């Protein structure tokens, strides 16, 4: 049986790595925003951060909550509907559930710091274009699914997050915003797992359909260029009020 052939019995798993390396590892890494103390971050925000640093952090956090909702929908709606294997569906639902934890956590950070204009993210050109690129790819046949999954796993769960993570983590290196820094560590762990397993699933598709890789190559490379351009615009938006103490937009 192949990845797209339905299996009614729960077991035996045909693709057990999606249980052991996907579902189980994510389940073992469970966390909630309530575990993160934020009193120090509030004090840093009110007393130590400059206006440009606050603008930088705000530009990042407002976008994160909305983006995580779209990523959750991708796992729980698209991936689950494409692959009728319990082990893959369970992994996808677990990943989607974890993305809701990220969304709640970022919303909690926003509200704690007084950043609650969530709709502003959707109307700001640089961030809106980046957001649209994450959810624009559809798939209704193996080739379309392969293109969508490769682009999503490599860029939505990979490239699109890490410049912002690096910026936020830079504050922890200055002994600032430690609560946000802790959340970044946990989020990076989760997103790295999601990207890894999504890419693994795409490669599995290519093993079962050797023509798929060649057929997807052009669109994936085009998406890479699009995401790079969108990410550069997003970085310019983050640093619109200038560089910060230990980090420059160029970096």
Q: What spans do the regions from the language model cover?
A:
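Non-heme di-metal
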Residues: 1-251
């Amino acid at each position: 049986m192949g990845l797209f052939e339905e299996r009614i019995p729960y077991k035996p798993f045909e693709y057990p790595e999606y249980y052991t390396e996907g579902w189980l590892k994510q389940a073992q890494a469970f966390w909630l925003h309530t575990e993160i103390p934020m009193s120090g971050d509030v004090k840093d925000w009110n007393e130590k951060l400059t206006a440009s640093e606050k603008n930088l952090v705000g530009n990042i956090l407002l976008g994160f909550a909305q983006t995580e909702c779209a990523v959750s929908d991708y796992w729980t709606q698209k991936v689950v509907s494409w692959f009728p294997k319990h082990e893959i569906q369970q992994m996808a639902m677990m990943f989607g559930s974890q993305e809701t934890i990220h969304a709640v956590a970022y919303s909690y950070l926003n509200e704690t710091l007084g950043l609650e204009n969530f709709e502003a993210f959707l109307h700001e050109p640089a961030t809106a274009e980046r957001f649209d690129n994450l959810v624009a790819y559809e798939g209704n046949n193996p080739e379309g699914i392969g293109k969508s999954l490769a682009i999503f796993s490599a860029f939505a769960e990979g490239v699109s997050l890490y410049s912002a993570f690096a910026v936020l983590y830079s504050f922890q290196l200055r002994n600032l915003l430690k609560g946000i820094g802790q959340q970044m560590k946990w989020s990076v762990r989760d997103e790295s797992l999601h990207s890894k397993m999504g890419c693994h699933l795409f490669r599995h598709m290519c093993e079962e359909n050797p023509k798929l890789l060649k057929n997807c190559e052009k669109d994936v490379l085009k998406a890479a260029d699009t995401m790079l351009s969108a990410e550069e615009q997003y970085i310019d938006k983050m640093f619109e009020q200038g560089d910060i103490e230990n980090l420059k937009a160029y970096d």
